[in-house]
C-alpha cells in the first residue's frame, strides 16, 4: 500500500486526500491550523473548506509536517501556487529521499515566472522524474461527494505516473497518465485567468454567446503559450486543457468564475475576496505572471491582458471588453 502525505487542507487538498483514501492509499494530511487537523481526525470533516462532507475514518491529519511526511512515498503539494516556494523551503529537509512529489497547485510563480514543477525542482533539488502534476476538470466539492470525474497525472517518469494513477483510481475518479508536464501546467494555470474573464462577462449580464467566445478564444491563447513552451497541442485539447477550462469557466462552484462575477458587478478585489470566504482567486495573482510569461515568448494573449488590466490597473470591465472588440480583425 502506498503512503501519502497531503500537505495543505484546503478544499481541493481535502477532496484529493479523500480520493486517495478511498483508493486504498494510507493518507495523512497536514493542516496549517491545529483546529482543522483536529476536526478531520475527531469529526471526519473539514468544516472550514468542505462543510458537510464526511471524510473516511482512515484519513488522518496533523499540524506537524514532519509527522505527516514520515515514511511517505507520495507527497502531495496542495497549497496555493504563490505560497508553494515558502512552504517547500520549510518542508524540503523532511521529504523522504525518493518520494514522488505531486503538485495540485495551478499557477505561474510571480517574479520568477516558473511553473510549479520548476519551483519544486529548484527548491528541493529533486530529479525532474520525481515531480508530477495533476490537472483536469476537478471541482473539489463534486469530487468529494463522489460524482464521476477524470483527471490527468503528468510525469516524465512513466513508472511513477502509473504508481500515482493506481494510488488515486476509484469508482468515481479516473486518472489518465501523460508525460506532458508542461502542457498540463500551462492548461491549469491559464484556465483560472480565462474563468475570471467569463465571470466578469456574466457579472455585467452578458450571455452564452459571449461566454462561449471567451472560452474558445481563451483556449487559443492557452495553446499558443503552451506550444511556445514545448507543450503538446493534444494535451491542451484533453482533460488538462479543454476539460479543466470548461469546468472552471462555467461552474458556480468555480472560485475564479465567482470572483470574476463580483468584479463584473462592480465589486472591488477586496469585496470579491470577502464573498469567496476570504480567499483570493488564483487567477487574480496568475494573470500578471501568465501575461509576463507570454510577453517573454512573444505570445499574444489579449484576454489575459484584459483580465490583468481589470484586476491590477483599474480598467472597468465594459471598457476592457470594448478594447478587445476594437482590436484589428484577422483570420481565426
Swiss-Prot record:
It catalyses: sn-glycerol 3-phosphate + NAD(+) = dihydroxyacetone phosphate + NADH + H(+); sn-glycerol 3-phosphate + NADP(+) = dihydroxyacetone phosphate + NADPH + H(+). One of its GO terms (biological process) is phospholipid biosynthetic process. It is an enzyme of class 1 (oxidoreductase). One of its GO terms (molecular function) is glycerol-3-phosphate dehydrogenase [NAD(P)+] activity. Pfam families: NAD_Gly3P_dh_C (PF07479), NAD_Gly3P_dh_N (PF01210). Belongs to the NAD-dependent glycerol-3-phosphate dehydrogenase family. NCBIfam families: PRK00094.1-2 (NF000940), PRK00094.1-4 (NF000942). This is Glycerol-3-phosphate dehydrogenase [NAD(P)+] 2.
Amino acid at each position: 500500500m502506498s503512503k501519502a502525505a497531503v500537505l495543505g487542507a484546503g478544499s481541493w487538498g481535502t477532496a484529493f486526500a479523500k480520493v486517495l483514501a478511498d483508493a486504498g492509499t494510507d493518507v495523512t494530511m497536514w493542516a496549517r491550523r491545529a483546529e482543522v487537523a483536529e476536526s478531520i481526525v475527531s469529526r471526519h470533516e473539514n468544516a472550514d473548506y468542505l462543510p458537510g462532507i464526511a471524510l473516511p475514518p482512515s484519513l488522518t491529519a496533523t499540524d506537524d509536517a514532519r509527522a505527516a511526511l514520515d515514511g511517505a512515498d507520495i507527497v502531495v503539494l496542495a497549497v496555493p501556487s504563490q505560497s508553494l516556494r515558502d512552504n517547500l523551503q520549510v518542508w524540503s529537509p523532511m521529504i523522504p529521499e525518493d518520494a514522488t512529489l505531486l503538485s495540485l497547485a495551478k499557477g505561474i510563480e510571480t517574479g520568477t515566472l516558473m511553473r510549479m514543477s520548476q519551483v519544486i525542482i529548484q527548491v528541493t533539488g529533486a530529479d525532474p522524474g520525481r515531480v508530477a502534476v495533476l490537472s483536469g476538470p476537478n471541482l473539489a466539492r463534486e469530487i468529494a461527494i463522489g460524482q464521476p470525474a477524470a483527471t490527468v497525472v503528468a510525469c516524465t517518469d512513466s513508472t511513477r505516473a502509473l504508481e500515482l494513477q493506481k494510488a488515486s483510481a476509484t469508482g468515481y475518479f479516473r486518472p489518465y497518465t501523460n508525460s506532458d508536464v508542461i502542457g498540463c501546467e500551462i492548461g491549469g494555470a491559464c484556465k483560472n485567468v480565462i474563468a475570471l474573464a467569463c465571470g466578469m462577462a456574466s457579472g455585467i449580464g452578458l450571455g452564452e454567446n459571449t461566454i462561449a467566445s471567451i472560452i474558445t478564444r481563451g483556449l487559443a491563447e492557452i495553446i499558443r503559450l503552451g506550444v511556445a513552451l514545448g507543450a503538446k497541442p493534444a494535451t491542451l485539447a484533453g482533460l488538462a486543457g479543454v476539460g479543466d477550462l470548461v469546468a472552471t469557466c462555467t461552474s458556480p462552484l468555480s472560485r475564479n468564475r465567482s470572483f470574476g462575477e463580483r468584479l463584473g458587478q462592480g465589486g472591488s478585489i477586496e469585496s470579491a475576496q470577502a464573498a469567496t470566504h476570504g480567499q483570493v482567486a488564483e487567477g487574480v495573482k496568475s494573470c500578471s505572471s501568465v501575461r509576463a510569461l507570454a510577453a517573454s515568448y512573444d505570445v499574444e494573449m489579449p484576454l489575459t491582458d484584459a483580465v490583468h488590466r481589470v484586476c491590477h490597473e483599474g480598467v472597468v470591465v465594459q471598457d476592457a471588453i470594448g478594447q478587445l472588440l476594437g482590436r484589428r480583425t484577422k483570420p481565426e
